[in-house]
Amino acid sequence: MALLDDVKSELAAFEGDSPAAIKAQAAAMIRFGGGLRPVQNTYVIQAVFTSLDVAEWLKNTLRNTFGHEAEVNHLTRQTPNGPVETYVVLVTRNVVALALQTGLVDRRKQQVRGLPSEVVNGSIAQIKAAWRGAFMARGFLSDPGKASFLEIACPTEEAAMALCGVARRLGIQAKHRTLRSSERVTLKDPDAIERMLKLMGATRSAREWTGKRSDGEARGKANRLANFDDANMRRSAKAAAEASEKVQHAFEVLGDNIPDNLRQAGQLRIDHVDKSLEELGKIAEPQITKDAIAGRIRRLLQLAEKTEKARAAEGK
């Protein structure tokens, strides 16, 4: 748990976000950490965390950004594996107003089961902040030496689907699964995990996690790259890596405005940097030729370039 605690503390210390991103992070922390709770004919907002740094961040943000006071209660419960420390952020006054501000309820005062629409349709900075908040609340990370995974336990299926959806806007394919009646969003590819940690703001922890992991798949990739004897294969690997970076940038530029066939081709290039175009075509669904894969990636990059030029022209 030490590395996970370090990740959450690093995220709690992240600075430089816009007010909209800070609000998105706080909303996700409350949504995934607890939410609106009925208590004796009234409501409270409650969020439970395993990190004091995380709880203090939310308490301070509720005061400084939203103008609401919250208290942090420290609880200890005994488990078969020993005592577990938790920190409960509790708001008991002006609860409905805060619920509206954070998107826990909509304008009709109906509870939102997923993520607030302002977050789902927000900027890339808001998307990163929402993932950061969800991870701070209910995130898990594999220990070095074990099979790689990054996972978030979600309060509802709708929240899990929303988290997967906004991850695609970051160019990352997250998977939703149900485990013993618990909704989970999971990343298993080591490269995607490292990228998500960096996008959330845990750059130091990402380096530490990557340096320590001894994942068999990671070793296999490293060995294949290290053992390239053919100069043509080296050039192909370099070109694939460069194409992957360009596709990642295209995803960030275009957001949701990407045709499905182009998005699929781009995602395959990102997820399988070490594979040739022919191999990408074989694992596509349905299978397509290497020329078709190359053409779709080329059109994706051209669309991003055209969009960037149009935005630059509008800004003049």
UniProtKB/Swiss-Prot annotation:
Pfam families, per the entry: HTH_WhiA, LAGLIDADG_WhiA, WhiA_N
BP term (GO), one: cell division
Residue ranges flagged as DNA-binding region: 276-309
Any one GO molecular function term: DNA binding
NCBIfam families hit by this protein: DNA_bind_WhiA
Function: Involved in cell division and chromosome segregation.
Matching HAMAP family: HTH_type_WhiA
Alphabetical list of PANTHER family matching this protein: CELL DIVISION PROTEIN WHIA-RELATED
Protein name: Probable cell division protein WhiA
Phylogenetic lineage: Bacteria, Bacillati, Actinomycetota, Actinomycetes, Bifidobacteriales
